[in-house]
Amino acid sequence: MKSKVIKKVAAVSLSALMICSLSACGGSGKKEVEKTEVDVNYADIKVGEDYTDIEADLKFLTHKTDMVDTKFQEYIEEFQKLYPNVNIEYEGITDYANDITTRLTTGDWGDICMVPVTVDKDELSNYFTSFGNQGDLAKVYENDMLNSYAYDKEVYGIPSMANVQGIVYNKAVFAKAGITELPKTPDEFIEALKQIKEKTDAIPLYTNFSAGWTMTAWDAYIDGGATGDANFVNTGLTKGANPFSDRKDGTGPYAVYSTLYNAVKEGLTEEDPTTTDWEGSKGMLNRGEIGCMALGSWAVTQVQAAGDNADDIGYMTFPITVDGKQYAAAGPDYCYGINCNSSEDEQVAAMCYIKWLAEKSGFAQSEGGLSIVIGDEYPEALAALDGVELVVNQPAEPGEENLFQDINNDSELGINVSGAIPTQIVEETTSGTMTLEDMVNEWNEKWTAAQEANGVTAE
């Protein structure tokens, strides 16, 4: 990737996904389907030159329900110019995070899917085909983006794109409010929201509380973007003592969650969070009826397309500064996986299509994300991140690949999974009795108990 300094950070970055792992949710009941071994190196495939005569009918399970009958059909048409005998049928799943886990246990769910985080790393080979050695793939793709579904040096998921975690905002609203510089600290952000409330008719910060999954965006800010620590999830969260406590320097998880708390407490969000409307919010932000929303970079193009004011939509990093420098967490979005039980021709055809999607389709850029291909340019929508240091996934130590997920599950805090913490913040601040400190103490107690249950002595 160009124009950015890239660090490594811990491996968690998807939005609203299930808390329990596949094995914990019944993976042991997987239907016995014969696994098909394929002796093809994905990295060596030359798209449009190799396997152009292959015949296959592929079923592709996707969470992108809005694209099944539109953009994905265009992709199929373009791909078939190179591979005319490969037919692809997309199936959009509305409740993807939950349904895909159940579907995987049958073994015959289709040929390509977006790999859920519910699959433990040591179980990946039971469900998915290896794309090959990570070192070979890292010659073409950003190595750090391959870590999420890599195990024992084999890669089982190719990222569809990478996301940066930040804030989508309306530049015209910010200008009308007299905000001439983007906020770089939580205090500056709250002050900017107050200016929007005082000088415009826009809702300063729209939580999208009712959608549920949107609340996980706040979880995505707490690691590298809020700390500048390249190993924060593995050390500061998984093995750290009381990770939600106030650091007293405007950084870390507390700084993120307290920003949401203060925004809601001071009336800088919508009047009734239970009435928020995700689909409608995109048009509202486009029209300047909303000042900003906490969402990944993937949301930029959706908001731009939701009205006539695409040029008014901008993206900024979350307002935290660490020792004078700003960071932004970045990591892979959903990753493409291939059913290891599909036939050899189906697996090879699936590899060709996935490689075309990753390298030729322009999908990542069109969705406001980052391409994982080394050297690809950043989309124009993310130009404001110039000079911000991106922090990317670092895997856990060998033997600890599932440790964070186990602690996260046992604590029931659902970081990057259920949005339990930011959801509680909104609920308690609007209609509850707990103070922020009450909630912080509760989170620390739950996390400590989960650490101890998994043999971790906090450092």
Regions found by a protein language model. Give the residues of each.
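Short, low-complexity disordered leader/linker segments with a strong preference
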Residues: 1-58, 81, 445-459
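Hinge/lid segment of periplasmic solute-binding proteins
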Residues: 34-50, 116-166, 172, 190, ...
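Short, solvent-exposed loop/beta-turn-alpha elements that line the ligand-binding surface or hinge
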Residues: 50, 132-143, 225-255, 305-308, ...
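Extracytoplasmic/periplasmic substrate-recognition and gating elements
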Residues: 77, 81-82, 87, 177, ...
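Periplasmic solute-binding protein
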Residues: 123-127, 145-182, 208-239, 330-340, ...
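C-terminal capping/gating helix-and-loop segments adjacent to ligand/active sites or protein-protein/ligand interfaces
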Residues: 150, 367, 376-377, 390-452
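Glycine-centered hinge/linker elements that transmit conformational signals in sensory
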Residues: 193, 238-273
